[in-house]
């Protein structure tokens, strides 16, 4: 447990940052989930619209260090790949 006043302050700051970062990570997951739901409905336009909303949020969180930049790139790439697969007619 923190004993000095500065250590107590740092512990308080760390807890505040942790909870704020957790809410931001949750927000990113929600945006990603919305895109995945739109993809699952096989609606390319709706999925694209959700993707367009999600990309700046994902990028912003990667810039702030909330999620790793490679993880952000991976999410964007996979979501975009699924959306493109919806747009291309299935080979019969």
From Swiss-Prot:
SUPFAM superfamilies found in the cross-reference section: Ribosomal protein S20
Gene Ontology terms: biological process: translation
MF terms (GO), sorted A to Z: small ribosomal subunit rRNA binding; structural constituent of ribosome
Biased composition (Basic residues): 7-20
Record GO cellular component, one term: cytosol
Coiled-coil residue windows: none
Highest taxon in the source lineage: Bacteria
Region described as Disordered: spans on this chain: 1-23
Keywords: Ribonucleoprotein, Ribosomal protein, RNA-binding, rRNA-binding
PANTHER family xref list: 30S RIBOSOMAL PROTEIN S20, SMALL RIBOSOMAL SUBUNIT PROTEIN BS20C
Family, similarity comment: Belongs to the bacterial ribosomal protein bS20 family.
Function text: Binds directly to 16S ribosomal RNA.
Record's protein name: Small ribosomal subunit protein bS20
Organism per entry: Pseudomonas fluorescens (strain SBW25)
């Amino acid at each position: 447990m923190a004993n000095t006043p500065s250590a107590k302050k740092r512990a308080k700051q760390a807890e505040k940052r942790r909870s704020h970062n957790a809410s931001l990570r949750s927000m990113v997951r929600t945006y990603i989930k919305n895109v995945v739901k739109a993809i699952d409905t096989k609606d390319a336009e709706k999925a694209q619209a959700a993707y367009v909303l999600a990309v700046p949020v994902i990028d912003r969180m990667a810039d702030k260090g909330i999620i790793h930049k490679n993880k952000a790139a991976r999410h964007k790439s996979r979501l975009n790949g699924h959306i493109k697969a919806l747009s291309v007619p299935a080979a019969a």
